[in-house]
Swiss-Prot record:
<keyword id="KW-0378">Hydrolase</keyword>
<dbReference type="InterPro" id="IPR006473">
    <property type="entry name" value="Peptidase_C58_Yopt"/>
</dbReference>
<feature type="active site">
    <location>
        <position position="274"/>
    </location>
</feature>
<keyword id="KW-0843">Virulence</keyword>
<dbReference type="InterPro" id="IPR038765">
    <property type="entry name" value="Papain-like_cys_pep_sf"/>
</dbReference>
<dbReference type="GO" id="GO:0141030">
    <property type="term" value="P:symbiont-mediated perturbation of host actin cytoskeleton via filamentous actin depolymerization"/>
</dbReference>
<dbReference type="GO" id="GO:0004197">
    <property type="term" value="F:cysteine-type endopeptidase activity"/>
</dbReference>
<keyword id="KW-0788">Thiol protease</keyword>
<dbReference type="InterPro" id="IPR003951">
    <property type="entry name" value="Peptidase_C58"/>
</dbReference>
<comment type="function">
    <text>Cysteine protease, which is translocated into infected cells and plays a central role in pathogenesis by cleaving the C-terminus end of the human small GTPase RhoA/ARHA, a regulator of cytoskeleton. Once cleaved, ARHA loses its lipid modification, and is released from the cell membrane, leading to the subsequent disruption of actin cytoskeleton of the host cell.</text>
</comment>
<keyword id="KW-0645">Protease</keyword>
<dbReference type="GO" id="GO:0006508">
    <property type="term" value="P:proteolysis"/>
</dbReference>
<comment type="similarity">
    <text>Belongs to the peptidase C58 family.</text>
</comment>
<keyword id="KW-0964">Secreted</keyword>
<dbReference type="Pfam" id="PF03543">
    <property type="entry name" value="Peptidase_C58"/>
</dbReference>
<protein>
    <recommendedName>
        <fullName>Cysteine protease YopT</fullName>
        <ecNumber>3.4.22.-</ecNumber>
    </recommendedName>
</protein>
<comment type="subunit">
    <text>Interacts with human ARHA.</text>
</comment>
């Protein structure tokens, strides 16, 4: 399966800063099943003003960090402004409109919201949009950090925010999340292998089961478009007779890819994390299955083939702390 570099891979025309552009046209932007055609004619001076405002928005403002440098002296990662940052901001905005519907549905199926988090808006988006390799989203890195934190009996959000409340970021955690995503986006690098290596360094290992007299990692792939959600949910909820397991779930479609995560426990239920919507808990697997099938899949817009509604891959992990 292709590596997950963010939400969407989009081809944009390259414009040099010195060109005398009379118009800029974004055509056939596809977000989920929504086809958006934006044609905007701008004078050269007006274009300069808009670009200047966008660059200023992405490069200035209150830091909202607990300190300027990490504990080992590294600065928060940034890169030069690119036009793709504008496109990604538009996509994040559309995805953020689905947040209320997803969160409001949780209680209807007997679930609870543990933490309201969304990488598609607010201060967190402001931090990731400043680097070209994180502007599209850091779902893979967020899921990896969420699994590690949960396995350690901690909350990712206590580690990400000062005092566990939105407002000020702990730069060490923010830097670590962004760097893992950046490392996975490098040329000639397999992002899955980068994440696996990071897991190993942090006490997380792939679950191995015996097949044909050999130990192999639990790695389930399939399609959601033609086979529905049963195969995907079975892979997420299967604990292989052990009673628990961490799941890193890759979803992909024609234009995009996304990562979500879960901790499944036969006794305590399912804790589910989606970087676009937050962390939720369901007291048993059946409640989670019904919510995912009847509400979440549609409300999130993940069911569209143009989005992430075609293929899946579910990996199962264990931790020394569990």
């Amino acid at each position: 399966m292709n590596s997950i570099h963010g939400h969407y891979h989009i081809q944009l025309s390259n414009y040099s800063a010195g060109e005398n552009l009379q118009s800029a046209t974004l055509t056939e932007g596809v977000i989920g099943a929504h086809r958006v055609k934006v044609e905007t004619a701008l004078s050269h001076s007006n274009l300069q003003k808009k670009l200047s405002a966008t660059i200023k928005h992405n490069q200035s403002g209150r830091s909202m960090l607990d300190r300027k440098l990490t504990s080992d002296g590294k600065a928060n990662q940034r890169s030069s402004f690119t036009f793709s940052m504008i496109m990604y901001r538009m996509i994040h905005f559309v995805l953020s409109t689905r947040v209320p519907a997803v969160r409001e549905s949780v209680a209807n199926y007997g679930g609870n919201i543990n933490f309201k988090f969304a990488q598609t808006k607010g201060a967190f988006l402001h931090k990731i949009i400043k680097h070209s390799d994180t502007a599209s989203g850091v779902c893979e890195a967020l899921c990896a950090h969420w699994i590690r934190s949960h396995a350690q009996g901690q909350s990712l959000f206590d580690q990400l925010y000062v005092g566990g409340r939105k407002g000020k970021f702990q730069i060490d955690t923010l830097y670590s999340i962004k760097q893992l995503q950046i490392d996975g986006c490098k040329a000639d690098v397999d992002q899955d292998e980068v994440t696996l290596d990071w897991f190993k360094k942090n006490g997380i290992s792939e679950r191995m089961i015996e097949r044909h007299c050999l130990l192999r990692p639990v790695d389930v792939t399939g399609t959601t478009e033609s086979e529905g959600l049963d195969q995907l949910l079975n892979a997420i909820l299967d604990t292989h007779g052990i009673g628990y397991g961490y799941k890193k779930i890759h979803l992909s479609g024609q234009m995009s890819a996304h990562a979500i995560a879960a901790y499944v426990n036969e006794k305590s239920g399912v804790t589910f994390f989606d970087p676009n919507f937050g962390e939720f808990h369901f007291s048993d697997k059946e409640k989670f299955r019904k919510w995912f099938t009847n509400s979440f899949w549609g409300n999130s817009m993940y069911h569209y083939p143009l989005g992430v509604g075609q293929r899946f891959r579910v990996l199962t992990f264990d931790s020394k702390e569990v």
